[in-house]
Amino acid sequence: MIASKFKIGQQVRHKLLGYLGVVIDIDPEYSLEKPTLDEVTKNDSLRKFPWYHVVMEDDEGKPIHTYLAEIQLGYEDTVIHPEQSTLDDLAESIRLQLQTPRLRN
């Protein structure tokens, strides 16, 4: 079993670019069919570590779905981000959905 550093609904920050994001899904290892050079560097060992589906915002505030290696992400300590409140809302919504049990018929 591979342990992941981040969890679904957690806010993270891209280490190189500094963008704020929210983890929406986790793959135990790289799982896209054909990796491009941008997605996986020449070091193939990155494929064996967790990869994260992360929602970030572009410069216009529109959501972008990204697929990032664990090594590219860092912890985000601040919970409230007035400049990107939609990401705060998304993170809170995901966390509430994961905590609240749902009845299924």
From Swiss-Prot:
<dbReference type="InterPro" id="IPR022866">
    <property type="entry name" value="HspQ"/>
</dbReference>
<keyword id="KW-0963">Cytoplasm</keyword>
<dbReference type="GO" id="GO:0005737">
    <property type="term" value="C:cytoplasm"/>
</dbReference>
<dbReference type="GO" id="GO:0009408">
    <property type="term" value="P:response to heat"/>
</dbReference>
<comment type="similarity">
    <text>Belongs to the HspQ family.</text>
</comment>
<dbReference type="Pfam" id="PF08755">
    <property type="entry name" value="YccV-like"/>
</dbReference>
<protein>
    <recommendedName>
        <fullName>Heat shock protein HspQ</fullName>
    </recommendedName>
</protein>
<dbReference type="GO" id="GO:0003677">
    <property type="term" value="F:DNA binding"/>
</dbReference>
<dbReference type="InterPro" id="IPR036623">
    <property type="entry name" value="Hemimethylated_DNA-bd_sf"/>
</dbReference>
<comment type="function">
    <text>Involved in the degradation of certain denaturated proteins, including DnaA, during heat shock stress.</text>
</comment>
<dbReference type="InterPro" id="IPR011722">
    <property type="entry name" value="Hemimethylated_DNA-bd_dom"/>
</dbReference>
<keyword id="KW-0346">Stress response</keyword>
